[in-house]
Design a protein with these regions (language model features):
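An amphipathic, aromatic/His-enriched active-site/gating alpha helix that lines ligand/cofactor pockets
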Residues: 29-32, 63, 67-75, 95-145
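Short, solvent-exposed mixed-charge patches
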Residues: 150-151
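Hydrophobic pocket/interface hotspot
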Residues: 41, 53, 94, 104
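Bacterial N-terminal signal peptides that target proteins for export
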Residues: 2-14
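N-terminal signal peptide c-region/cleavage motif recognized by signal peptidases
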Residues: 22-24
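N-terminal, post-signal-peptide region of Sec/Tat-exported proteins
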Residues: 46-93
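Short beta-strand/turn micro-motifs at beta-sheet edges
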Residues: 27-31, 80-83
Length: 151
């Protein structure tokens, strides 16, 4: 009996067994990677308050977003107008894109100094001002979306 022949047979069987483990790992590779995270806020602007609310967004919200971009907290932001299908749907969307889900951890603590710098209001004053904007708009809700980047 040739001992080399026996070794090559064992090596072949070992290689075959290892290939069974490699195939599931290959098959399990994701076809995408996690991309940026976008927060979409649906807003219903009160009739007659559109210009007032847009002025607020231009004066305060935009400034806060620009500073957040400079700090690296925000990748981009947009304001979208919409044509609602019924009177209870949003007619404005505030869209903010963050680099990743982890960036949302501690976001309030990150944004407070920026908000204070831009608006010259402390947290309590900013919270009160947000409540007063209720005469201009109703916040209908938020949706968090993660972009899935196809490989």
């Amino acid at each position: 009996m040739n001992p080399n022949r026996n070794r090559s047979g064992i090596a072949w069987i070992a290689a075959l067994c290892l290939s069974f483990f490699a195939m599931p790992a290959f098959a399990q590779e994701r076809a995408y990677s996690d991309g940026p995270v976008t927060n979409v806020t649906a807003v219903k602007v009160v009739d007659g308050q559109f210009q007032n609310y847009m002025s607020y967004l231009q004066k305060n919200w935009k400034g806060v977003m620009e500073e957040a971009k400079k700090a690296g907290y925000v990748l981009d932001y947009h304001v979208y107008g919409a044509t609602p299908h019924n009177p209870n749907e949003a007619d404005l969307y505030l869209v903010v894109t963050y680099p990743n889900m982890a960036m949302l951890d501690g976001m309030t603590e990150k944004m407070e100094p920026i908000q204070q710098k831009v608006t010259k209001m402390n947290f309590r004053e900013a919270d009160e001002a947000s409540g007063k904007r209720g005469v201009m708009r109703t916040l209908l809700g938020e949706e968090l979306l993660r972009e899935l980047l196809l490989k």
